[in-house]
Amino acid sequence: MPILVTSASGTNGNGFGALLAFELDGRFRGTFIEDDRIADPRGLAVDTEENLLFLNSGTDRVLAISSDGTVVRDTGRIEGLNPGGGNFGPDGRYFVGLRSARTIIALSTSLDAAVEHVLPLQVVPFPRGFAFGHDGQLFLASGIGPNGQGDNAILAFTLGAPLQPSRLVTDPELSPLDLAIAPNGNVVVSSERPFGALDALASVREYDTKDGHLVRVFSPNGKAEFRKPRGLRFAPNGLLYCVALDEVVGFDFASGECLGAIARLPRLNGQALVFFPY
């Protein structure tokens, strides 16, 4: 099952500004789709019901892409959208983090209905990634923005209830970039602290969702460069993958062992990754 990676461009990184494809053995397959609507691509998620790839584009739109690399749905340009990460929620809708508005919205998978704000505007200083727990709870990483402002925390929300977010994680060594839910239900976060520093410590950190305590720290242990970690995804076989500056790094989640660079590409500047059969 190929790995698809969004490669940043512009202020988000000197990458290719494209959706790139790799084999699981690391071979680079090239650009998955050539389309002018895709520029500085960001979040990705797969709708397994329809086998469609949903992509957040820096052109202020969300696209749905078929397995043959064709855009089949398009929100059209939404003024000021500035999307970040994307994930499907328990109700089947596609949720998108907004960088400028600092909130999360929901879209129907048809991409032709009105946008719904599921959290208030400016709910965090800078959203860095989010995912839904096994019980439907929403976990949101609050990190440092490009201007150097923000905080470093993980918040928990119960949608549909009065808004009473709880600060799940306060870890002095954490500066989150993305967040995923592990098979065991815990929160897994990619981190670079201090954010943007040349000597930043990059890691993947696992937290218990009940009380927020740090369970484990995943480190490259010399098997990968692991600079500027960003998007996280679990593969169907349970391995954990994290995209970074010049590589995609794998971890055996059961043992915590780093598997090294699964794929390498100079200037990758990866933002998000998914596993998408095509």
Q: Predicted regions span which residues?
A:
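Residue position within the beta-strands of beta-propeller blades
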Residues: L4-S7, F54-L55, V96-G97, F139-A141, ...
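Structural recognition of the beta-propeller blade-terminating site
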Residues: E23, N56, I65-S66, L107-T109, ...
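A short beta-strand motif characteristic of beta-propeller blades
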Residues: R27-D35, T70-R77, A113-L121, L163-T170, ...
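A short loop-to-beta-strand structural motif that recurs across blades of beta-propeller domains
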Residues: F16-L20, R61-A64, R102-A106, N152-A156, ...
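Structural signal for glycine-centered tight turns and loop->strand junctions in beta-sheet-rich domains
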Residues: G26-F28, T48-E50, G69, G92, ...
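Beta-rich, blade/repeat-based domains predominating
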Residues: N14-F16, D35-E49, I78-Y94, S100, ...
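An edge-strand/N-cap motif at the start of beta-rich repeat modules
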Residues: M1-G30, F276
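Blade-level signature of beta-propeller repeat domains, shared across WD40, Kelch, NHL, RCC1
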Residues: L245-Y278
